[in-house]
Amino acid sequence: MTESLMVAINFFSLLSFVITIKNAMDKLGNYITGKWIEGDGAGQELYNAVTGKVITNATTEGLDFEGMLQYAREKGNSALRKMTFQERGRMLRALALHLMDKKEKFYAVSVLSGATRVDSWIDIEGGIGNLFSNASLRRKLPDETFALDGDPIALSKGNTFMGHHLLVPKEGAAVHINAYNFPVWGMLEKIAVNLLAGMPAIVKPATVTSYLTEAVVREIVASGILPEGALQLICGSAGNLLSHVNSQDVVTFTGSASTGLKLKAHPNILAESVPFNMEADSLNCIVLGKDVTPGMPEWDIFIKEVRKEMTVKAGQKCTAIRRIFVPENRLEEVSKHIHAELAKTTIGNPLNEKVRMGALAGQGQREEVRSQVQKLLASSQIIYGSLDSVAVIDADAQVGAFLSPLLLLNTTPFESYEPHNVEAFGPVSTIMPYKNTDDAITLSKKGKGSLVSTIVTADPEIAKQYVMGAATHHGRILVLNAECAKESTGHGSPLPSLVHGGPGRAGGGEEMGGLRGVKHYLQRTAIQGSPSMITAISNVYQPHAKGIDNGAMHPFKKYFEELTIGDQITTQKRLITAEDIDKFADLSGDHFYAHIKDTDFGDTMFEQQVAHGYFIMSAAAGLFVDSYDKNPVLLNYGIDELRFTKPVYPGTSIYVRFTCKEKIAQEMKEKNPDVEFVKGSDIPKGIVKWYVEIFDDKDEAAGVGTILTMVQMKNKI
């Protein structure tokens, strides 16, 4: 028995289980105020996209939407705000591991939406990947419930008054109104960010595929990993939810531009100045560089990328390629090659291992796509596929929501309105010619703002010209060629570490993007005061703040828990000699002219031989390091923000002021019970940042930097 056949059999078993459960419960649950509740009334029937059969109903009628928000603010928000970024990050990682362990259940449910295994992988494991990615961001954040943003700002000549920026979690809830195409990824990519920031979420998935979102939320709730109130789910209408949001809440929307604009203009959103992030479907494009010819690797890369983006998820992706721009002298060749690739696409029941493209999410979606294609045909013609018929495997083409891939041709892109304004949200794309790169840039902008654009070229000049010209109208631009194609994540894949969103029609919003996304859920407040007061507030030592005299106790003798922000020592002095500089030059091999005593310094920035900056830093380490006895400091972890502010000449004495700046606890690595623990492979520890100030014998700063050490803990976390 083949592996793929076994997978199919397992799918059928799980699918039967899922359908049985749904038939027994009749309606999807809504998880609100800590319990599962069914809405009143029959609600909306939800269908199997492949068989056309009813699988369940969804309704939110009778639910207390105002109460949901209040519960999120009072329960979820208060619990999350008490957790540090490190704790929230570990929570996300635990949730990701739990969901990954349950993923086959989700794959079984995903089949109901018409998704193939590959389609579902993007949605399910791609969504879980967002949890892992955001969990790892904790390493860039403090071990606090808040964070500082940017650098300290000196506001006085005498260094007694300064400013900084503070980030704290908003006191409301994140309301996520999501699209139907990615019921798992759409939820997880958003809640991963707000949970790390310290805000709870109310998720409203698109009703048509909300059964898959509900299945995932049931596992999240069952895990007990999230604090009470951190996540609520409504399957069906959002009712009057937006009438009760306030300025401490954040609303996000993913879907059509028309629906998004209506929600964005909600009277309460405007009256309360509620942050609203909109990510709308857009007319994304791909450009074949004029340098690319048949036989080049980039030619095949282009053709395959178009085919992939037209058929994965049956073209139901907000990032899918809707417009294809090719040099006018290559239009016929490219069209034939895309035609040939699309002809290889097998369509039908996703449970059949031969199928490469499944159904649209439902009959309603298929009719909407057909309607939009009719509009496109006002200025274009179909050169591949049919609106009315499609050959399918193990399914009924009329009962299921199946549609043929449709490649349209438009030969007058500058004069035509439809290809740049009408989106058919399915396996549909329009190919159009251009004369030169400037034309391609202009055509790309006719989409009035897009989530993503790709240019396939081997020419760096063409790539640069296109990127610089098109960047104003795109949230992301992929430059694809033979060098990166094998490892490229592709045109249609937003990544958690990069921003997702776009200007204009694409919604004007921005989500994900690593720490950039987290800050959408944090209030940034400017704080002012003395350096010592800002240090006390932030738990990060600020320049010119008062230090804590450790007396005879060197801070390197303290365990992580014993160290206090502001612990400080001032070292003895060391005389820097010409002989020291010569020896360091020989030892390091750095014989830069400024470090050679025989140099003619007449036309230089220096008076005489000057010490290497790295020698001064090394000499500083010799002054502040407690070198003799074994102590809790495990190792030197690195240097941040090192600056040499004044030349040090032979005959100058230097000394160091050494201050505990910041502490970040680290969790122990998970032990494998089947592998014997090796001493030294991991011990309880944390990262300690030290503020190092190097002064000369005039008490003027010669250097400043932050060094990082790994320091042992007394206790595990």
Describe the residue ranges of each PLM region.
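Rossmann-like NAD(P) dinucleotide-binding subdomain of oxidoreductase/dehydrogenase enzymes
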Residues: P142-I301, Y434, E487, G509
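ALDH superfamily catalytic-core signature
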Residues: A222-G224, V250, T259-F414, D438, ...
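Conserved C-terminal structural/oligomerization subdomain of aldehyde/semialdehyde dehydrogenase
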Residues: V50-N57, I225-E228, S247-V250, A340, ...
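HotDog/MaoC-like acyl-thioester-processing domains
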Residues: P555-I565, F644, V648-I717
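N-terminal Rossmann-like NAD(P)+-binding subdomain of aldehyde/semialdehyde dehydrogenases
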Residues: V18-N159, K344, A361, R370, ...
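Catalytic strand-loop segment that frames the active site of acyl-thioester-processing enzymes
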Residues: G551-A611, M713
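Short, well-ordered beta-strand elements within core beta-sheets of diverse protein domains
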Residues: V54-E61, G76-R81, L155, V175-H176, ...
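Hydrophobic beta-strand-centered segment that forms part of the acyl-chain substrate-binding groove
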Residues: G602-A611, F615-I664, K671
